[in-house]
């Protein structure tokens, strides 16, 4: 495997692949987002890592984005393109699936993000 040039990375995504998130489709969502990252030409600037449980099972599958300190919820394969287009390509934080931002006093309790499907 080739060595990754860490100096090119702008965003590091952590994909929860703990038991509950896996049961909710985390593996498929992870694979699809990784595919879209490469397809969009972002493979050098976006690094991805699978993790175990991040402690927000009811909101899963979870993605954490660094260095922004953003947590995203309910990340299914069906939301992958929306996430990549809005967040990684356009640089917009999709509020409907944002769970938390470091430093905020509370979790974003907006309605379920199911409306983002498809």
PLM-predicted stretches and their roles:
Residues 10-26, 49-65:
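Local cysteine-cluster metal-coordination motifs and their immediate loop/turn environment
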């Amino acid at each position: 495997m080739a060595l990754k040039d860490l100096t090119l990375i702008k965003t590091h995504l952590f994909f929860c692949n703990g038991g509950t998130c896996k049961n909710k489709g985390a593996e498929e969502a992870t694979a699809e987002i990784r595919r879209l990252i490469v397809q969009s030409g972002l493979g050098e600037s976006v690094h991805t890592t699978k993790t175990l449980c991040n402690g927000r099972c009811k909101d899963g599958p979870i993605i954490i984005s660094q260095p922004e300190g953003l947590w995203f919820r309910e990340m299914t394969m069906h939301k992958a393109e929306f996430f990549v287009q809005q967040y990684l390509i356009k640089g917009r934080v999709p509020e409907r699936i944002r769970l938390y931002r470091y430093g905020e006093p509370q979790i974003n309790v907006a309605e379920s993000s199911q409306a983002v499907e498809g």
